[in-house]
């Protein structure tokens, strides 16, 4: 029941300078939702989009209009708007923008928090409960349907969006544990989106998924200083 899909990045509802491209995004998103419905998948995470030269207010209105055009077809699958880092002209980088989309879309939508994106957008993840309090006041915690769990390679407010392995970034292991085990979010599905581990990313045959070992760390609530060595030993 907790299978969650992610929409392709090619979809951009924010920019409507080219009507043909905007309607392509609408049709593409409809196709994704149809496939999710056929598979019985209940949630689809969506990056809200990038303004690409438009004023942010106009871009947000385009997203809202696009969502309404898509969702009038009454899909069973719920769109989850992902919180973004603020790289380039991304929309959905703060609570005000997410709130606008949630409040003004004529159909129900949810929210997917991304811990790296929150950090890079300027949220102090050591004070995550304060953020949840504000989120609850502005939007409602019931709208949080998924959390992407990542550390970050960059400092708070960098607007860079570069994921890091759990405990090896600027958010830190303890802060991430506090998010994962937060009592108010205990029933929210959490998904690791951390990078593969390898000697060089160019050598695709020598990079390995870290998830087995990161999940072990999370369950044990103990940071593994030799995580990368253990991953290499396991896969070699």
Give, region by region, the residue ranges found by the protein language model.
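N-terminal pre-domain/capping segments
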Residues: 1-7, 13, 17-31, 221-236
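Conserved, mostly hydrophobic/aromatic
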Residues: 6, 36, 44, 79, ...
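Active-site acidic/histidine proton-transfer and metal-coordination neighborhood
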Residues: 12-110
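Short acidic/polar active-site loop segments enriched in Thr and Asp
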Residues: 42, 145, 186
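Acidic/histidine-rich catalytic cores of soluble enzymes
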Residues: 65-166
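A short, acidic, amphipathic alpha-helical segment used as a generic capping/interface helix at domain edges
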Residues: 130-137, 168-184
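A short, acidic, flexible beta-alpha connecting loop/helix-capping segment that sits on the rim
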Residues: 191-210, 234-235
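C-terminal helical cap(s) of enzyme catalytic domains, especially alpha/beta-barrels
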Residues: 201-228
């Amino acid at each position: 029941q907790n299978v969650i899909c992610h929409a392709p990045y090619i979809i951009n509802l924010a920019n409507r300078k080219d009507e043909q491209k905007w309607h392509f995004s609408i049709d593409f998103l409809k196709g994704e939702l149809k496939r999710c419905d056929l598979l019985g998948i209940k949630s689809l995470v969506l990056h809200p989009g990038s303004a690409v030269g438009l004023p942010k207010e106009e871009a947000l209105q385009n997203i809202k209009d696009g969502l309404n055009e898509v969702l009038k077809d009454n899909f069973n699958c719920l769109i989850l708007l992902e919180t973004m880092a603020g790289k380039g002209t991304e929309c959905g980088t703060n609570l005000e923008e997410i709130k606008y989309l949630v409040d003004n879309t004529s159909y129900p939508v949810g929210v997917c928090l991304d811990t790296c994106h929150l950090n890079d957008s300027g949220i102090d993840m050591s004070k995550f409960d304060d953020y949840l309090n504000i989120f609850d006041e502005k939007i409602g915690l019931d709208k949080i349907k998924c959390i992407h769990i990542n550390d970050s390679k960059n400092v708070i407010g960098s607007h860079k969006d570069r994921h890091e392995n759990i405990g090896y970034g600027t958010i830190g292991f303890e802060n991430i544990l506090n998010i994962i085990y937060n009592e108010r979010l205990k029933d929210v599905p959490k998904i690791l989106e951390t990078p593969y581990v390898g000697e060089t990313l160019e050598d695709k045959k020598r990079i390995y998924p870290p998830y087995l070992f990161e999940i072990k760390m999370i369950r044990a609530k103990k940071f593994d200083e030799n995580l990368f060595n253990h991953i290499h030993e396991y896969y070699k």
